[in-house]
């Protein structure tokens, strides 16, 4: 009898211990005024009970964890439910931010992580490492191409890596409409988030503050947490980070339970208020006003003294025939100011026709200005007419040309600024993350669509004449846009172009250019070289390599002959690769660079090949013209070093002669 009572007493004590342990990891915080949390970085609890992860400064991160670990006795009991309210508030004068994450981590010490796109979770060494023992639900408000983000407003599930195993645009399920409604994370408004785990399934649900928990989760993914946390123990908390993109990141309330049934609901009426940050606007003092008036008088006198000099400095060439192009003409003064005097700090790049600078115009926003040297007055009217016509062409995969300016011996071309630069930076710059095959193929399709429009869809046939990776720009979504139309020429459909100019870049120029001049087939040749360049991750001409690898066309053809065509692809290519697609694009590149112009496909056919609506012709490395690369060199010898070489060319159109000089670099620029 005594032994039975003793056994019952032991079982009762163990039950009390389990209940106590469970209660220690179940809580509700309607504000964090009384919460005992571990914080580091810039994270802190404000006097009103608001948990602030970041304080509006750049390149910072902050963490906040519940101090007691969440433990499970067996994988079957591996479950939890949590509910929190967050707010991401933009900082006045800044764009965006890098978002926050709800974190499950084997350790509370994440101080070795990096801010910015790493969200305070990983650094370049721990990113992707299984030893990180970390799972996160990210609310990401910045598009990071290196992590294959889908957009700049998404929710993702991360396991030891910021390359999410599942992600979707931020939204919540509307019970009234029976569909998902988009929700903006970086709005400054409080957002509810539920994270439920059980049965090896992780569910994430979002909703605005005053809406009850939707019946359908936004994101659901099978995941075995016992594999990530073999010790069956982890800490729960939050992480936030900023970079050059800055926002204020707050947690208003948080509740946690081991199951959904016992999860306590946050009382939204008790949650602390989110501060609204406004730009400081203090009225100027009397002394400051007087000083400003005196300064204005001095400046006015100085401007008056320099007026004549400045008029001469900013003098432009304006002729009668330019009146019809008035809306497309910019003043030199406006462009000079927009580019901060063509400051070298704003230099985006330089090529055969001149340098490109970044600028900002109040009416147009951010722009790119290319300064083209042009001493010849003959043919200028035709050139300007074609530039203006180019600006009238509208296509989603062409960099919009906004207009021009003429001054003395130079022409300035103004286009929209592309924030992600040119494609060649991601192909040949080791400081940039190499693109995946999927992204490369999408960019290839973008440029094919643009060229097809220029050849067949525009009012006149437009020949680009300089298709290469450095002339392919990337917009905010990393879509490919064909740019740099300084060499473009027009002609009517069904007629031959009236040009005999051999302009362009070595390796992209069709062999027949020197004899028959430019036509759509020569553009196709340049596009073929571009296909090989993007897929192989090397320039069409590489004098530094062995002789048999100099010219990409011959080298890819030789790889095909050796039954190793796939081996020609860029070895740095990330992500999953479709061998069938890669081989198709390489073969299409060889078909486009066929030495016989009549055997090259049209851009219309090329678009269908790339979209899979038309099969590639049955060709082999021994087919006529395939791999018969004869580089067009205006001179006596092929390039043997990446030194600068100058070519003088001329073209005629409408009985006018336009003389230019093109500086073509051996490195393909």
Curated annotation (Swiss-Prot):
Disulfide bonds: none annotated. This is Probable L-type lectin-domain containing receptor kinase I.6. One of its GO terms (molecular function) is protein serine/threonine kinase activity. ATP binds at residues 348-356, 370. SMART domains: S_TKc. The gene is LECRK16. Residues 23-285 are extracellular. It comes from Arabidopsis thaliana. Residues 342-614 form the Protein kinase domain. Pfam families: Lectin_legB, Pkinase. In the C-terminal section; belongs to the protein kinase superfamily. Ser/Thr protein kinase family. Residues 1-22 form the signal peptide. CDD domains: lectin_legume_LecRK_Arcelin_ConA. Glycans are attached at residues 123, 180, 203, 224. Residues 24-257 are annotated as: Legume-lectin like. It is found in: Cell membrane. The keyword Iron does not apply. The chain crosses the membrane at residues 286-306. Its EC number is 2.7.11.1. The active site is at 466 (proton acceptor). It is a single-pass type I membrane protein. The keyword Membrane applies. It comes from the Eukaryota. The lineage of its organism: Eukaryota, Viridiplantae, Streptophyta, Embryophyta, Tracheophyta. Gene3D superfamilies: 2.60.120.200, Phosphorylase Kinase, domain 1, Transferase(Phosphotransferase) domain 1.
